[in-house]
From Swiss-Prot:
Name used for this protein in its record: Lipase member J
One Pfam assignment: Abhydro_lipase
Ranges in a coiled coil: none
Catalytic residues (positions): 141 (nucleophile), 312 (charge relay system), 341 (charge relay system)
Annotated family: Belongs to the AB hydrolase superfamily. Lipase family.
EC number assigned by the record: 3.1.1.-
Statement: the UniProt record of this protein carries the keyword Lipid metabolism: yes
Enzyme type, top EC level: hydrolase
Length: 366
């Protein structure tokens, strides 16, 4: 099922939009405007919550569990107007006004462009469509990264964000342990040769078959689980095994090779910086300086709440501590001892540990 079909399957209303970025990418934006049994369809006064997915995932990550354990549905049931964005290059954002997806030009992007073009276009559309002055923003993983960049560099977008909820935030990567990123760094030439400098781990029929047919089988389920834990961290007791086929049928949802290389460039760094084009001359063309510029977190004044886990291989607790020290307006910070990188999406106890707290903070700030 696609995202709209998942929303409809559980009895919720859904709206789907194609929005166009300043540089011509066409992104899928999804909306759950109200909850299943709500007959009051007056949306004028509804509080808007915008959700942005992480690396190699899509908006489906917010609705992959049962309604009582999926943030997209939980927020709709709580009376909020829910919007879910998609970053360029994933399953639901692989279109462009004039570039073909088979071209290298289409895939010449990283999270720099997601922060510069995708997120501003998505938030601007959401704000105009709902006629709301401010919205609440929830990001997971890379969804927090592009939030940090956008809100620290584009003030007109930052002014629209009431509170930034950062789940498993990634900014500093000095202590990052994820084998996926480290292998990309170590085997850069192999990755580029294998992927042709275009898309990285896109959703395909073969991978969908593996996720929906093979992973549920007892002989394969441990293999699939170990792949997840190798990438994100170990926490087998907090994962809903009955939904494993759903997770794998939608993920990985793809990104660009350049985006993965960008992440690999940041290994062992305590600061987030723009993509390094590989030579002083090319950097000079793109940035008017010979090195890729750093992003300055202290320029962001958006109220920020953070949830992270001690078993997270992508958002290591030490890195999150570095990030926390640079946030000028932090309002909440919680570390969960056993959480890995995807527990804040798929954890069995995620409502108790994270989601109800998000709703409480929203209600306290209306």
């Amino acid at each position: 099922m696609n995202i709209s079909q998942i929303i409809s399957y559980w009895g919720y209303p859904d709206e789907e939009y194609d929005i166009v970025t300043e540089d011509g990418y066409i992104l899928g934006l999804y909306r759950i405007p109200y909850w299943r049994t709500d007959n009051n369809k007056n949306l004028a006064q509804r509080v808007v919550v915008y959700l942005q997915h992480g690396l190699l995932t899509s908006a489906s990550s917010w609705i992959s569990n049962l309604p009582n354990n999926s943030l997209g549905f939980i927020l709709a049931d709580a009376g909020y107007d829910v919007w879910m964005g998609n970053s360029r290059g994933n399953t639901w954002s692989r279109k462009h006004l004039y570039l073909e997806t088979s071209s290298k030009e289409f895939w010449a992007f990283s999270f720099d462009e997601m922060a510069k073009y995708d997120l501003p276009a998505s938030i601007d559309f959401t704000v105009k469509q709902t006629r709301q002055e401010e919205i609440f923003y929830v990001g997971h993983s890379q969804g927090t990264t592009i939030g940090f960049i956008t809100f620290s560099t584009i003030s007109k977008i930052a002014e629209r964000i009431k509170i930034f909820f950062a789940l498993a935030p990634v900014f500093s990567t000095k202590y990052l342990k994820s084998p996926l990123i480290r292998m990309t760094y170590k085997w850069k030439s192999i990755v580029m040769a294998f992927s042709g400098n275009k898309d990285f781990l896109p959703k395909t029929s073969f991978k969908k078959f593996i996720g929906s047919k093979l992973c549920p089988l007892q002989i394969f389920d441990k293999i699939c689980l170990n792949i997840l834990f190798m990438m994100f961290g170990y926490d087998p007791k907090n994962l809903n095994m009955s939904r494993l086929d759903v997770y794998f049928s939608h993920n990985p949802a793809g990104t660009s090779v350049q985006n993965m290389l960008h992440w690999s460039q940041l290994l062992n760094s305590t600061h987030l910086k723009a993509y390094d084009w590989g030579s002083p001359d090319l950097n000079l063309v793109h940035y008017n300086q010979t090195t890729s510029p750093l992003y300055n977190m202290t320029n962001m004044n958006v109220a920020t709440a953070i949830w992270n886990g001690k078993s997270d291989l992508l958002a290591d607790p030490e890195d999150v501590n570095i990030l926390h020290s640079e946030i000028t307006n932090h309002i909440y910070y919680k570390t969960i001892s056993y959480y890995n990188h995807i527990d804040s999406l798929f954890g069995l106890d995620v409502y108790d540990q994270v989601y109800h707290e998000i709703i409480d903070i929203i209600q306290d700030n209306l």
